[in-house]
């Protein structure tokens, strides 16, 4: 070969001496070695005869040959034997090696590399390009109209209503009445004194209005379910869950991963991602999961729940039989982004092992996933729908060998929207499996957990349910009645003046999120959107753009509220309060993760009172930082006026976007028709893909999930043609819900003590008969005769 011939020309033809030009010759030899290094595999296979001949040479000749080959094999060299001595350069690592995740220069957050190889090439409509063209066109046509616009803005500010009283009244904290009974009674007494002192005076000052807050009637009501503990449910839980093990010093000793007897490849993987010490949920879960027990785990957001179930899975898979490749683990997640992130976490933790992973989520190439599943990877991370698709339609893919099932964000997976898909998966997987469930708002309802097929699970609740982290500051901006329509003005004011970097804004609806995306673009705010109407490529691009700092705002629906771990998120803004406290906990959990600090702001109007009250009450119980932020009404009105002026531009952008989507759809249909003609025989030869539900059943499941999330309001809104409900309709619905809850009978204190049930029954019978007159029960209708005189 060429390198060897060059070496012969240097070493054999001419032997240099000290007096010769040694520098030039040495440089030439280095250049030869750097040009083409010999492969390592060649130096490993050395014939025995050659070894015997080489043993007769001097040791300095052996060293020279090793240097010529370009490397030294092993600790003791290529041809040396292991004499049992320890390498002098070896160092013991007693700690994890990395004190903090931020101090590790190699780790830059979880990426989407596992999904990119199965992604297509289409990018969809470039909304930024459309907005850029519209802005350039507008700026070019309105150069001479600067002065009239300035005058119009001054007139608009002069005509604006001064709502300072409303904003000062925000100090009553809109939901702060959710404290203890003593605080409520004290506030009520103060309110009565203030009202008596100011009776007959219409023009109270701002200070007086702050000093005498009037609590809302709904804030004083406490449901009977919160006051009385349901012992029947407690008995069910005691029978269903495994008995609590006595606390020992072993858990206290788990101050490091080394004390858990984990293998060295796993410890190296933990060090590479910056995990120095196990979190409480990890220190509790890993030893129990290694025993093969079922686990129901819950902890606050950002506490490392993914690593809590991935680490014991990897440790167990290190000792698997390796002769026949077998899929042994299935991890299910409710959203594609969460599954992709879980795949990234597991891949990095297993970077020093031979464990194989497969990502099977919707929106990515089926063929790529089928080819990976054909190799039978050890761990399959998937969403329920795509997993069922492969389970029914992919050849050479079987789930008979699955030994471990993990449900990430299990409370969401147990809701009505996933009920049918989850039942299909659970009935197909083997019964003798280990099952682990994790969530920040983990349910304790035994009736829901029974469906999963758990076998005496161990309940590991590190934190109380529906709890936020201590480092999170929660702020609420109250929108007084009549100002809900100016919500977008408040949002733009916050993003322009207060929170300008690394902000996630949550919306309830995809339509509003997309509308806000266009407004932000026209106002010059760099942003990206994330919701279900986008293609998977666009969704990944949006998350990566926000993660890399290319955009400052991520406008998302609740698609991004669960599990998404983006490094450095400083602020979360709720455009409106979510439907429940559980969703609120997951939303605000996108910031203040892994011990960092963060801020969550909620724009709350009157319909959001119920959720805000629950959030404030939960925050007060744990001592969280809760405050009310006051925004000047004039500032919000000025931004809302600018937004109203952009309505024509917004409609024009949406119209142009729709036209480009139609053109892209037509182009795709044309290519599809060409492929149908060109590959007709191959397409017809493919087996038809099947599903376990009909279209009618799928639609019913979607409606059930939507109804469980939004309640009766969604159905009533459809009845009114999709229009927003009036306050009157909303009050009717709330009254119906309260009446429905009141009809549900629960045991009281007397019934649990064995008393009161018969008495209550007698009272009900006597009340039905009528009032008692003269010691007798009067019958219904007109009384017969006069009562007896005494």
Curated annotation (Swiss-Prot):
Tell me the leader sequence span. Answer: none
Annotated region (Disordered), positions in chain: 19-234, 748-790
Keywords annotated in UniProt: ATP-binding, Coiled coil, Helicase, Hydrolase, Nucleotide-binding, Nucleus, Ribosome biogenesis, RNA-binding
**Where is it found, in Gene Ontology cellular component terms?**
cytosol; nucleolus
What superkingdom heads the lineage? Answer: Eukaryota
Job description of the protein: ATP-binding RNA helicase involved in ribosome assembly.
> How does this polypeptide assemble, per the annotation?
Associates with pre-ribosomal particles.
Q: What is this protein called?
A: ATP-dependent RNA helicase DRS1
Q: Which organism is it from?
A: Pyricularia oryzae (strain 70-15 / ATCC MYA-4617 / FGSC 8958) (Rice blast fungus)
């Amino acid at each position: 070969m060429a390198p060897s011939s060059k070496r012969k020309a240097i070493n054999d033809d001419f032997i240099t001496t000290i007096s010769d030009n040694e520098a030039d010759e040495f440089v030439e030899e280095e250049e030869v070695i750097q040009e083409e290094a010999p492969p390592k595999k060649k130096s490993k296979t050395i014939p025995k005869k050659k070894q015997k001949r080489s043993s007769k040479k001097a040791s300095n000749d052996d060293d020279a040959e090793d240097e010529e080959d370009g490397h030294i094999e092993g600790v003791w060299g290529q041809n040396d034997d292991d004499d049992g001595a320890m390498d002098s350069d070896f160092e013991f690592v007693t700690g994890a090696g990395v004190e903090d995740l931020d101090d590790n220069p190699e780790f830059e957050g979880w990426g989407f590399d596992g999904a990119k190889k199965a992604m297509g090439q289409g990018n969809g409509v470039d909304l930024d390009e459309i907005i850029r063209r519209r802005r350039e066109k507008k700026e070019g046509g309105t150069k001479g109209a600067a002065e009239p616009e300035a005058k119009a803005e001054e007139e608009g500010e002069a005509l604006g209503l001064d709502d300072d009283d409303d904003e000062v009244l925000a100090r009553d904290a809109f939901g702060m009445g959710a404290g203890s009974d003593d605080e409520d009674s004290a506030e009520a007494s103060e309110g009565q004194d203030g009202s008596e002192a100011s009776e007959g005076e219409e023009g109270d000052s701002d200070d007086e209005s702050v000093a005498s807050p009037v609590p809302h009637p709904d804030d004083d009501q406490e449901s009977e379910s919160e006051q009385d503990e349901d012992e029947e449910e407690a008995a069910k839980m005691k029978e269903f869950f495994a008995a609590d093990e006595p606390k020992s010093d072993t858990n206290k000793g788990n101050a490091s991963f080394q004390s858990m007897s984990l293998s060295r490849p796993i410890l190296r993987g933990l060090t590479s991602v910056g995990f120095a010490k196990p979190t409480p949920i990890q220190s509790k879960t890993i030893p129990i999961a290694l025993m093969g027990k079922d686990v129901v785990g819950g902890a606050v957001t950002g506490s490392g729940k993914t690593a809590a179930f991935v680490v014991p899975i990897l440790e167990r898979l290190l000792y698997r039989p390796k002769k026949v490749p077998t899929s042994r683990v299935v991890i299910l997640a409710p959203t594609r982004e969460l599954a992709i992130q879980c795949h990234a976490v597991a891949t990095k933790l297993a970077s020093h092992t031979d464990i194989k992973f497969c990502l099977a989520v919707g929106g990515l190439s089926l063929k790529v996933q089928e080819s990976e599943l054909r190799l039978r990877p050890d761990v399959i991370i998937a969403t329920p729908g795509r997993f069922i698709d492969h389970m029914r339609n992919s050849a050479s893919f079987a789930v008979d060998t699955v030994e471990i099932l993990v449900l990430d964000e299990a409370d969401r997976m147990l809701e009505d929207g996933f009920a049918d898909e989850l039942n299909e998966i659970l009935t197909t997987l083997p019964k003798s499996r280990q099952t682990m469930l994790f969530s920040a708002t983990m349910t304790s309802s035994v009736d829901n957990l029974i469906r999963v097929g758990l076998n005496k699970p161990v309940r590991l609740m590190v934190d109380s349910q529906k709890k936020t982290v201590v480092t999170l500051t929660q702020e609420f901006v109250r929108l007084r009645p009549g100002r809900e329509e100016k919500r977008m003005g408040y949002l733009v004011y916050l993003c322009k003046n207060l929170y300008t970097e690394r902000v996630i804004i949550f919306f309830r609806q995809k339509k509003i999120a997309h509308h806000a995306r266009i407004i932000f673009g026209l106002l010059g705010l760099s942003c990206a959107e994330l919701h279900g109407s986008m293609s998977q490529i666009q969704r990944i691009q949006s998350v990566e753009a926000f993660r890399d700092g290319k955009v400052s705002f991520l406008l998302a629906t609740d698609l991004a509220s669960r599990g998404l771990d983006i490094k450095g998120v400083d602020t979360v803004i709720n455009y409106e309060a979510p439907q429940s406290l559980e969703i609120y906990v997951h939303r605000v959990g996108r910031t203040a993760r892994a011990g960092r600090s963060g801020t969550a702001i909620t724009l709350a109007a009157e319909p959001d009172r119920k959720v805000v009250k629950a959030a404030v009450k939960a925050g007060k119980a744990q001592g969280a930082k809760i405050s009310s932020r006051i925004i000047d009404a004039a500032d919000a009105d000025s931004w809302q006026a600018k937004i109203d002026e952009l309505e024509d531009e917004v409609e024009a952008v949406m119209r142009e976007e729709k036209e480009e989507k139609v053109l892209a759809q037509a182009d795709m249909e044309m290519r599809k028709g060409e492929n149908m003609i060109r590959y007709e025989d191959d397409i017809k030869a493919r087996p038809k893909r099947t599903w376990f539900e009909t279209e009618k059943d799928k639609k019913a499941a979607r409606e059930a999930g939507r109804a469980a999330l939004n309640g009766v309001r969604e159905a009533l809104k459809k009845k009114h043609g999709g229009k927003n409900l009036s306050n009157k309709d909303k009050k009717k619905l709330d009254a119906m819900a309260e009446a429905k809850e009141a009809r549900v009978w629960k045991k009281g204190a007397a019934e649990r003590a064995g008393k009161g049930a018969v008495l209550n029954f007698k009272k009900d019978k006597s009340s039905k008969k009528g009032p008692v007159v003269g010691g007798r029960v009067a019958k219904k209708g007109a009384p017969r005769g006069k009562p007896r005189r005494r």
